[in-house]
Amino acid sequence: NYIPELYRRGVKNFVVTNVPKGYASDYPGANFLKVVNTLEALQRLAERHRDEFNIPIVGITGSNGKTMVKEWLYQLLSPSMFVTRSPRSYNSQIGVPLSVWLMNEQTQVGVFEAGISMPGEMLALRDIIQPTIAVLTNLGAAHQENFSSMEEKCREKLILFHDAETVIYDGDDEVISKVIAEYPDY
């Protein structure tokens, strides 16, 4: 149970699946929002937050190199504009919404990683990031055990590209080129 420690540290708002017994007396001034699924609640909240920004957003996916590309873009862009980026390697189902939540009124461009380890994960990340620019770094063996083929993994990663205005990928990679050819809009 993480609530007592967080409350001691000053956190007063909690999203929970079960409201703790005695919450009014044990946690005066705290608010508890009860939801069916805390992960989905976090993701939907981040999605709504992202909707508030009409700025360039770079979404980066790939088997390797996401963090390096993100940090390189940050170093390139940050001298001339305020960039919000994923901290460290926050590219998971929890890390992406926490990263997007960091955007504020100063943010001029967002740069976020999106990592997946199984089919069905990229849709939620795409809806949160909503990239205007999408980058596929490479396609490798990482997390391959949950996919039936490299093509299946590539298709899952390309979900991030759905509404992007600009798509960047390695056109020399045979698998990526083959799967990209299935999507004439790219």
Which residue stretches match the model-derived regions?
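N-terminal leader/targeting and accessory segments in enzymes
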Residues: 1-44
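Short, hydrophobic beta-strand segments that form beta-sheet elements in well-ordered domains
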Residues: 11-18, 167-170, 186
